């Protein structure tokens, strides 16, 4: 299972656009530094089943080639300093999903 990709799924609600913009501008250099890849985002995700959590209005998905890369990104002290802007500006859930080999 080593070197399996890791996917990050973010659900968030932006409460302070100016503060979040500071975070957003600094996010991509850290993603690149830790070998991450932006996949997509959606400001109006469609809930096909169940109840859409009303507190969130944006979904973001990005990935890393390994769990170690994801952990290095998360634990980077400079990234954590930047993420203070995100924490101040949003309500958020962030999930780390480990890639798995398809079952046969």
Predicted regions and their residues:
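Short S/T/G/P-rich N-terminal loop/turn motif that feeds into the first structured element of a domain
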Residues: 1-75, 98-104
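C-terminal structural segments of small proteins and small subunits
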Residues: 71-73, 78-91
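Short, electropositive alpha-helical surface patch
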Residues: 93-97
